[in-house]
């Protein structure tokens, strides 16, 4: 428990804000968590469509995401039932000109060596290039002297066109949500270091069996409430300022409330607005953003894919937008026949939803050689236009600490090793809570 409990407000009920609130509560500080939306989770939350609770975007966690997994356990999530744990894999439909790469359950680095040896769809020169990349990256300590794009890094390491198309580019999009031609090579290496370059379990892929709100944010709110804190949804912050006694005054839903510390855990643009209102004089570095689109396709009950997840060969020129497909019926008992297709590409937003869904359904029918997949019963398109920041080389990201006692920032956009991921958000929330606690002690 803290020696002197401080009353702290956390503004924003996304994953970063929930992580900050749990960390503060764990350290004995009374917390008030404010979320302007009706549900917790921010850009990773459950949404209702056609009587089903799905996600506003399909997410994969890695076994390396220890801070996320530890906090989930702390708030009462059973990791064994909350996830389908798969070995690291990249598998394309058998009728596509793709690859089949699955890491066996062997100790590292044997699991990667055996996976590479057994991989189909890769030629000898592709496998040698992958082995060369892995060994050199390890020798370098997964560090670059100067950041560059992922595409430039792959060129320096003489990676083959086929390996880039089938493995590196899809991995880059999945991890950073930024095209390889624009993505930070150092951040990409950070993700590879903590997955491919770590223990076998760290490279495991964790597919959620719960909707994203239930996976952490809702349990986090229950956790802090059990410890006497409060969590308020639909709680719009109207103003934030500091009084002469160095306490923070927050106006929420026409009420003024007073706190010793504040963590701003909103997106960057709203954080900047609040910093301006508080008269901090701080200016956050500018960010650009990338979209993610999820296309849900409902088929007849019992319609299944051979595996829960596949990588797809995308080709915007041929109206093949899908990059990954998930059979949610293998993850959620009440979602038989529901497929989720993930698209990270700017061109598709120029299409109407009906045209986009039809194109994706045709892509699945062709990729799996199953004509019935061209005709779903219904579809739903969900686009997060500012899903992640563009993770470009040498990007300046703000620190959690602001230099103002009792005030910190939290969010996946803050300074850290990872791109805009759930682990990045949770790590930032933990760090922000620690910074506020330390600043109020001095």
Predicted features, each with a name:
Residues 6-33:
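N-terminal Rossmann-like FAD-binding beta1-loop-alpha1 element of flavoenzymes
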Residues 191-248, 252:
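Helical element adjacent to the flavin cofactor pocket in flavoenzyme catalytic cores
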Residues 68-69, 73-74, 78-185, 189:
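Mobile amphipathic helical/loop "lid" adjacent to a hydrophobic cofactor/ligand pocket
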Residues 25-49:
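Glycine-rich FAD pyrophosphate-binding loop
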Residues 16, 39, 269:
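Conserved Rossmann-like nucleotide-cofactor binding loop
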Residues 324-442:
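Conserved flavin/dinucleotide-binding core of flavoenzymes
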Residues 238-354, 363-367, 398:
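Mid-domain catalytic core of redox enzymes
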Residues 45-63, 133-138:
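Glycine-rich active-site loop/strand segments that organize a redox cofactor
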